[in-house]
C-alpha cells in the first residue's frame, strides 16, 4: 500500500468511515469531503494525521494534503467508495431488521436542521465566491500550461529581435507555440460557458455555445452588429467572461423553465433551440454591451488604484491577500485578472498579490531557524516550504502560519513589503493566471523579470525578519507541538 493510500484510509476513518461520506472531490491542494453527520468527524484525529497540513470546515470538510498528493488521495478514496470523484456515494438504509426508524428519523431531522443552519451561515456572497471557484479552478492547469508556452514563445521572439538566434524553424516554432497558447486564451469564453453551465445546472454544451456567441465569429466584412446603447459596433469578446457567466446563469433559468413547460416528446429538440435563441439575443444586444461597460470600468479602477497608489496600494494589496485566501475571498479577483489580460495583455494585480505567498515563505524560513526544537513544526515545514516557493501557499497557511497565529500576521507584513516594492517599480504584469512565487517568473510581461525578483526577495526578507523578531513565542521554540 502506498503512502497516499494509507493517508486516504486514515482520513476516511477520521471523518467517520465511508458510511459517513456523501461525496469526495478535490482541488489543487485539498480533498473536499461532504459528510452526512459532522458529529461523527474526529477533528483532532484528522488534524494530527501525518500528511494532513490543515483542515477547513465549510460546506465540505476540506483536508489540505498538498499538490500532487491530493489527486492520489482523492482518487483512492473514490476507488474505495466505488463511484467517480464528485458523485454521491450510495448508502443502504432499506434494511428494516437492522434499522431503527425512530433513530433514523431523529438523525434525519437533526441533519436537516444542521443543513438549514449551514444555508443561513453560507450567505449569498459565499455562494457567489464558491461558484466563481468552481468555474475557474478546473481551468487553472490550462491557464498555467498555455501561459508558460506563450512565455517561451515571447522569450524566443525577443531573442530573435536581439539577434541572438535566427532561422525559419525558430519562426515556425514561435508560431506553433502561439497557436497552442491561443487554443486556451482565444476560446476562454467557450470554456467558461461550459463550466458555468455545469455550476448553474444548465446543459454544458449550451453554455459553451453562449460563450462562443460573444466571440461574434459569424460576423465578417460589413455585417456588423451595433451596440444598442452607444450606436458603436460590438467588438468580439466585449463583456468578457463577466458577461458570459451572467448570460449562462440566465440560460440555466430559461432552460429549467422550458423543461417544465415543453412536452417530453419534443423537449430535446425544442428546449435547446428556444433557450439558445432567447439567451443568444439577450447576450448580443443586452449582456455584452452592459457587461462590457462593467468590465471596462472595473479594470480601469483597478489599474488606476495600482498606478496612482504605487507603494501604498502595493503594500495594502500584498498585506491583505493572505487573509483573503484564508476566507476564500481571493476567487473574486479571478475575473478581474482575466479581464485585465484580455484588455491589456497582462494583469498588474497578480504580481502584487503573489507577494503575500512570498512573505509567508519568508516567515516559514524564520520558523525553521528559530524553532529548531519543534520537530513537529519542522517536519510540516519540510513538506510545505518547497511548494510554497512555487506559489502554492495553502499548506503553509493551514498547516503552519495560521495555527500558530503570530507568524500569519508577520507573513502578511512581509507580503505587504514585497507588494510595496512591486507597486513602487510599477508596470510589472503577468500574461496568465495560475501560479505565483517563483513559478510566476516565466509569465512576467514586458521583460520586467528583475523587478519581480526584487519584489520576491524583499517579501522573503520582510517575512523572515518580522517573524524572526516578533513572530515566535517561547512555547513555539521549545516545545514539540504545532501551536502555542
Curated annotation (Swiss-Prot):
Pathway where it operates: Cell wall biogenesis; peptidoglycan recycling
This protein's GO CC annotations: plasma membrane
UniProt domain PTS EIIC type-1: residue ranges: 130-484
Reactions mediated catalytically: N-acetyl-beta-D-muramate-(1->4)-N-acetyl-D-glucosamine(out) + N(pros)-phospho-L-histidyl-[protein] = 6-phospho-N-acetyl-beta-D-muramate-(1->4)-N-acetyl-D-glucosamine(in) + L-histidyl-[protein]
E.C. number(s) listed in UniProt: 2.7.1.-
Molecular function as annotated in GO: kinase activity; protein-N(PI)-phosphohistidine-sugar phosphotransferase activity; protein-phosphocysteine-N-acetylmuramate phosphotransferase system transporter activity
Signal peptide stretch: none
Protein topology in the membrane: Multi-pass membrane protein
Keywords recorded for this protein, A-Z: Cell membrane, Kinase, Membrane, Phosphotransferase system, Sugar transport, Transferase, Transmembrane, Transmembrane helix, Transport
Cellular localisation: Cell membrane
InterPro entries registered for this protein in UniProt: Glu_permease_IIB, PTrfase_EIIB_Cys, PTS_EIIC, PTS_EIIC_1, PTS_IIB_1, PTS_Sugar-Specific_Components
CDD domains reported for this sequence: PTS_IIB_glc
Residues annotated as catalytic: 27
Residues that span the membrane, as ranges: 135-155, 160-180, 200-220, 234-254, 274-294, 305-325, 349-369, 384-404, 408-428, 450-470
Every PTS EIIB type-1 domain range: 5-87
GO biological process, one term: peptidoglycan turnover
Chief location of this protein within or outside the cell: membrane
Purpose: The phosphoenolpyruvate-dependent sugar phosphotransferase system (sugar PTS), a major carbohydrate active transport system, catalyzes the phosphorylation of incoming sugar substrates concomitantly with their translocation across the cell membrane. This system is involved in the uptake and phosphorylation of MurNAc-GlcNAc, the principle peptidoglycan turnover product of S.aureus, yielding cytoplasmic MurNAc 6P-GlcNAc.
Protein name in the entry: PTS system MurNAc-GlcNAc-specific EIIBC component
Organism encoding this protein: Staphylococcus aureus (strain bovine RF122 / ET3-1)
Lineage per the UniProt record: Bacteria, Bacillati, Bacillota, Bacilli, Bacillales
